[in-house]
């Protein structure tokens, strides 16, 4: 048989002995030829008889020789069949107290993993028998009590989600083995669940009633948790399930004011108390077997929300909205209902005092805490009302930041749901305001949130873009000096080209170019500065790019660093006349000339030289002692 996963600490499987054996399993299919079906069928009576004879003739030392006489059987299969089924010395009866005590002692010595070693100390028992005996009976952590209803419920829900993966289910029930859970399900629970409806009614009662029709939750609603004594508006009746304390306002209830900025928000942000957060966790935890069904219903609700907002160009409210800080009824058109009917829903009634929270937050239905119940509200009304409620300080902060964001982020919560461990497949529709917005439905592809965004071709093929400051500088340059000219590169005549450019700019600006300083050309002086020992990078640049074919003279003359102290940035050749405003700016970047040395170098003082160079009496004595100590040893080669 195929191997089963071994993840539970109470698993009764072992990697070296997984094949279940029976004394006479001769009812299986006949062996099939081919490597694919090698050893996949049960042993026949003829194969067992032949294996017994071969063991009597050849012994149990070389199973490969025996396997040669049994087609479609390997040496390992022959060995396991003999040791676990056909061996006459194998004990298949009940375990004695002495054997149980021996197993306990050996497990304490070798641990609950080395079953082959443990089996060698028990004559007539194999490792699989010892393992199953320990996990099913002798392990002190294994529960031997009767099954409780809570354990049955866990098994029922886990089996609906995982199927016959008993090792995974055993992780949810500490103290129960996968084999015990499997036996309990097959012998008792499956019949009671399938035929008698066991645990099905209690499971439905414990789960929130979100399996209602699409008509009930496919609309935007402004609602609150109404106490049981609240009166429902006469215009309509509650929809499918009376557990919901909110009702839809019929389209006949017309109110006159105008809501300028309708925004879709999650209802639980506004009027769901904090204790209801636990209900949300129970709604959407990973163990919920109806999670997929809930997701589909939320997708349908989002589709309805989009259609309703598209149909609403102006959402009226009552005339005294600005004077009253509370909530008011709004007329919401539902275009998604198949028969045109409108299920009534109650909104918050008008009050001239601060609205009071429900007395019993725990009585709030779990359905009202769903993050997909949305509502339309007035911006100023929301801010004025929420500021009066200290219990909703966090709500105020969220709404204020939400309403002040750009229109591009109004549908952030609906377009970007929280990531789950499994990508959700569905069409998420955007919810936008009906004012100055494109009403085109935006459909997301499957698992779009987990995919790398596509790069536009224009970005890949476009030319490099010039930064804005450079654009302004180039524009000013073109206005002042004319359009830029692209000249061919002439590396061999670089010096001549630079001299021409400097001379041309100097002539245009009215300044005579000074090409000679102390009888030395300026460019040669520049190259000497770059060749200075303080700038090795300039040395590399000049040696590679300033060597011209036409330069036949020695360009790099030996010059002292003091002679090159004036900086080329202060030279008048490179400075063009500028206006007074520009001159003030450029002065900040002008490097001042280096100050010359005040006086020539003077000889050091004798006392200072003796102290700094180690010529004092103490230093001379220490140096002499060190030399004597070192000279006492012979010269040795340093071995690394």
UniProtKB/Swiss-Prot annotation:
<feature type="modified residue" description="N6-acetyllysine; alternate">
    <location>
        <position position="480"/>
    </location>
</feature>
<feature type="DNA-binding region" description="H-T-H motif">
    <location>
        <begin position="63"/>
        <end position="86"/>
    </location>
</feature>
<dbReference type="GO" id="GO:0045944">
    <property type="term" value="P:positive regulation of transcription by RNA polymerase II"/>
</dbReference>
<keyword id="KW-0804">Transcription</keyword>
<keyword id="KW-0805">Transcription regulation</keyword>
<feature type="region of interest" description="Interaction with HIPK2 and NLK">
    <location>
        <begin position="90"/>
        <end position="193"/>
    </location>
</feature>
<keyword id="KW-0238">DNA-binding</keyword>
<feature type="cross-link" description="Glycyl lysine isopeptide (Lys-Gly) (interchain with G-Cter in SUMO1)">
    <location>
        <position position="527"/>
    </location>
</feature>
<comment type="function">
    <text>Transcriptional activator; DNA-binding protein that specifically recognize the sequence 5'-YAAC[GT]G-3'. Plays an important role in the control of proliferation and differentiation of hematopoietic progenitor cells.</text>
</comment>
<keyword id="KW-0007">Acetylation</keyword>
<feature type="domain" description="HTH myb-type 2">
    <location>
        <begin position="87"/>
        <end position="142"/>
    </location>
</feature>
<feature type="domain" description="HTH myb-type 3">
    <location>
        <begin position="143"/>
        <end position="193"/>
    </location>
</feature>
<keyword id="KW-0010">Activator</keyword>
<dbReference type="InterPro" id="IPR017930">
    <property type="entry name" value="Myb_dom"/>
</dbReference>
<comment type="subunit">
    <text>Interacts with HIPK1, HIPK2, MAF and NLK.</text>
</comment>
<dbReference type="InterPro" id="IPR012642">
    <property type="entry name" value="Tscrpt_reg_Wos2-domain"/>
</dbReference>
<feature type="cross-link" description="Glycyl lysine isopeptide (Lys-Gly) (interchain with G-Cter in SUMO1)">
    <location>
        <position position="503"/>
    </location>
</feature>
<keyword id="KW-1017">Isopeptide bond</keyword>
<feature type="cross-link" description="Glycyl lysine isopeptide (Lys-Gly) (interchain with G-Cter in SUMO2); alternate">
    <location>
        <position position="480"/>
    </location>
</feature>
<keyword id="KW-0677">Repeat</keyword>
<dbReference type="GO" id="GO:0000981">
    <property type="term" value="F:DNA-binding transcription factor activity, RNA polymerase II-specific"/>
</dbReference>
<dbReference type="GO" id="GO:0000278">
    <property type="term" value="P:mitotic cell cycle"/>
</dbReference>
<protein>
    <recommendedName>
        <fullName>Transcriptional activator Myb</fullName>
    </recommendedName>
</protein>
<feature type="modified residue" description="N6-acetyllysine">
    <location>
        <position position="471"/>
    </location>
</feature>
<keyword id="KW-0832">Ubl conjugation</keyword>
<dbReference type="InterPro" id="IPR001005">
    <property type="entry name" value="SANT/Myb"/>
</dbReference>
<feature type="modified residue" description="Phosphothreonine">
    <location>
        <position position="534"/>
    </location>
</feature>
<keyword id="KW-0597">Phosphoprotein</keyword>
<dbReference type="GO" id="GO:0005634">
    <property type="term" value="C:nucleus"/>
</dbReference>
<dbReference type="GO" id="GO:0000978">
    <property type="term" value="F:RNA polymerase II cis-regulatory region sequence-specific DNA binding"/>
</dbReference>
<feature type="modified residue" description="Phosphoserine">
    <location>
        <position position="532"/>
    </location>
</feature>
<dbReference type="InterPro" id="IPR050560">
    <property type="entry name" value="MYB_TF"/>
</dbReference>
<dbReference type="Pfam" id="PF07988">
    <property type="entry name" value="LMSTEN"/>
</dbReference>
<feature type="region of interest" description="Leucine-zipper">
    <location>
        <begin position="375"/>
        <end position="396"/>
    </location>
</feature>
<keyword id="KW-0539">Nucleus</keyword>
<keyword id="KW-0656">Proto-oncogene</keyword>
<dbReference type="Pfam" id="PF09316">
    <property type="entry name" value="Cmyb_C"/>
</dbReference>
<dbReference type="InterPro" id="IPR009057">
    <property type="entry name" value="Homeodomain-like_sf"/>
</dbReference>
<feature type="region of interest" description="Negative regulatory domain">
    <location>
        <begin position="328"/>
        <end position="464"/>
    </location>
</feature>
<feature type="DNA-binding region" description="H-T-H motif">
    <location>
        <begin position="166"/>
        <end position="189"/>
    </location>
</feature>
<feature type="DNA-binding region" description="H-T-H motif">
    <location>
        <begin position="115"/>
        <end position="138"/>
    </location>
</feature>
<dbReference type="Pfam" id="PF00249">
    <property type="entry name" value="Myb_DNA-binding"/>
</dbReference>
């Amino acid at each position: 048989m195929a191997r089963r996963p071994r993840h539970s600490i109470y698993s009764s499987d072992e990697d070296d002995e997984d094949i279940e054996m029976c004394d006479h399993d001769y009812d299986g299919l006949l062996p099939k030829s081919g490597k694919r079906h090698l050893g996949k069928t049960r042993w026949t009576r003829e194969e067992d008889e032949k294996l017994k004879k071969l063991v009597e003739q050849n012994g149990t030392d070389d199973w490969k020789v025996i396997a040669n006489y049994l087609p479609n059987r390997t040496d390992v299969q022959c060995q396991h069949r003999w040791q676990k089924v056909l061996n006459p010395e194998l004990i298949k009866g009940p375990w004695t107290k002495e054997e149980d005590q021996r197993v306990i002692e050996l497990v304490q010595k070798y641990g609950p993993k080395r079953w082959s070693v443990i089996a060698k100390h028990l004559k007539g028992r194999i490792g699989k028998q010892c393992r199953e005996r320990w996990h099913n009976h002798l392990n002190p952590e294994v529960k031997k009590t009767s099954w409780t209803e809570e354990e049955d419920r866990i098994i029922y829900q886990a089996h609906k989600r995982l199927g016959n993966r008993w090792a995974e289910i055993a992780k949810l029930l500490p103290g129960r083995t996968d084999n015990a859970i499997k036996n309990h399900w097959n012998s008792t629970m499956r019949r009671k669940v399938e035929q008698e409806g066991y645990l099905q009614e209690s499971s439905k009662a414990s789960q929130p009633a979100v399996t209602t029709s699409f008509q009930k939750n496919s609309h935007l609603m402004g609602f609150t948790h109404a106490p049981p004594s609240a009166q429902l508006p006469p215009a309509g009746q509650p929809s499918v399930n009376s557990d919901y304390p909110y009702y839809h306002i019929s389209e006949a209830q017309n109110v006159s004011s105008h809501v300028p900025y309708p925004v879709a928000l999650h209802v639980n942000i506004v009027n769901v108390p904090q204790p209801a957060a636990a209900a949300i966790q129970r709604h959407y935890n990973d163990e919920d077997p109806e999670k997929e069904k809930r997701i589909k219903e939320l997708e349908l609700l989002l589709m309805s929300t989009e259609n309703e907002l598209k149909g609403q160009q102006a959402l009226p409210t009552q005339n005294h909205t600005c004077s009253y800080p509370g909530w008011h009824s709004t007329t919401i058109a539902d275009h998604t209902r198949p028969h045109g009917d409108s299920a009534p829903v109650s909104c918050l009634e008008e009050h001239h005092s601060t609205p009071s929270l429900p007395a019993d937050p725990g009585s709030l239905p779990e359905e009202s805490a769903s993050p997909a119940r949305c509502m339309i509200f007035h911006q100023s009304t929301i801010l004025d009302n929420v500021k009066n409620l200290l219990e909703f300080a966090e709500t105020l902060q969220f709404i204020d930041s939400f309403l002040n964001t750009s229109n591009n982020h109004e549908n952030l919560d609906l377009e970007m749901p929280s990531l789950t461990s499994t990508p959700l497949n569905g069409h998420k529709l955007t919810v936008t305001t009906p004012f100055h917005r494109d009403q085109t439905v935006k459909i997301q592809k499957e698992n779009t949130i987990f995919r790398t965004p596509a790069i536009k071709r224009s970005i890949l093929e476009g030319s490099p873009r010039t930064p804005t400051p450079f654009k302004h500088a180039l524009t000013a340059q073109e206005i002042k000096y004319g359009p830029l000219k692209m000249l061919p590169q002439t590396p061999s005549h670089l010096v001549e080209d630079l001299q021409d450019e400097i001379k041309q700019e100097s002539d245009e600006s009215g300044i005579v170019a000074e090409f000679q300083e102390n009888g030395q050309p300026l460019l040669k002086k520049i190259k000497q500065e770059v060749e200075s020992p303080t700038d090795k990078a300039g040395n590399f640049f000049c040696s590679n790019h300033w060597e011209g074919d036409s330069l036949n003279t020695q360009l790099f003359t030996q010059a002292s660093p003091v002679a090159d102290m004036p900086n080329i940035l202060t030279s008048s050749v490179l400075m063009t006349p500028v206006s007074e405003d520009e001159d003030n700016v450029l002065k900040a970047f002008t490097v001042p000339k280096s100050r010359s040395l005040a006086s020539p170098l003077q000889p050091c003082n004798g006392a200072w030289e003796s102290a700094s160079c180690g010529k004092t009496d103490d230093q001379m004595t220490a140096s002499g002692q060190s030399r004597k100590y070192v000279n006492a040893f012979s010269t040795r080669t340093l071995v690394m």
